Amino acid sequence: MSTGSAHVQMVIITGMSGAGKTVAIQSFEDLGYFCVDNLPPTLLPKFLELIRESGNKMNKIALVMDLRSRDFFDRLFVALDDLAETSWVTPKILFLDANDATLVSRYKETRRSHPLAPSGLPLEGINLERQLLEELKGRAQMIIDTSNLKPRELREKIVQTFATPTTTTFSVNVVSFGFKYGLPIDADLVFDVRFLPNPHYIEHMRPKTGLDEEVSSYVLKWTETQKFIEKVTDLLSFMLPHYKREGKSQVVIAIGCTGGQHRSVTLAEYIGRYFADEYTTHVSHRDIAKRKDTHR
């Protein structure tokens, strides 16, 4: 076992059922944490052993531990005490809470039963759970009351609290494609550039792509291309901050022409460069390797 392991930040997410633990674990995943949902406390020592033996390649971990684990109260405090004696792990407990009326309302909306009152009234289970979790809540380093928080607001609060300056929380993925091969199924925004002048009709450019300077210069020189770039970058400059504020971890922007060789490739490269200073950007060309004698 390595003795020179890197330090591990661990967040244990717990709290009242229905208070937002699912949103919380998704938020930590967006922050680059290695996440495990419903880890039984008895498995925590073995889990940490595996992390350490791996050389701590996962140095940020978020775990959901709650009443779904049958041995929750028997083993959790023992595991927490053991963690306190571990020099290479810094554990923090994030406790999510909400008032009774909010929790009852959420259970009614989802039509789910409370885990401690599967055949009874939700409030009975809530009251019992609140009593059982009282000591654990007292040991929490951070408590968030989600009674008046929308999922997006809870996500924002977690990101603001746990994000580091080097954490990548939002990325812009730009992909070129050919309409003849179908739309990218993961696209959030699709722009059709088939109205732009087509290098396919210039014989010596036909075998080239938008990655070639001659082709990109040809596509970009037209007034309609410049107008398109002006309008699209202005639109995206407005939209992207709002996507980020809503808690999205990435936005996929698809630029399409007929075959995905010339115009879409040129514009995808341009838009990727345009936003590279402000966001983490990735540019890919889905259909650039598909070469058939067709309009590009």
Curated annotation (Swiss-Prot):
**Where do the annotations place ATP binding?**
G15, M16, S17, G18, A19, G20, K21, T22
GO molecular function (one): ATP binding
Q: What keywords does the record list, in alphabetical order? A: ATP-binding, GTP-binding, Nucleotide-binding
**UniProt-annotated binding residues for GTP:** D66, L67, R68, S69
The cross-references to Pfam families, in alphabetical order and at most eight, read: PapZ_C, RapZ-like_N
Q: What does this protein do?
A: Displays ATPase and GTPase activities.
Q: Which HAMAP family match?
A: RapZ_like
Q: Which PANTHER family match?
A: RNASE ADAPTER PROTEIN RAPZ
Task: Write out the similarity annotation.
Answer: Belongs to the RapZ-like family.
Name of the protein in question:
Nucleotide-binding protein Aflv_2526
Species source reads Anoxybacillus flavithermus (strain DSM 21510 / WK1)
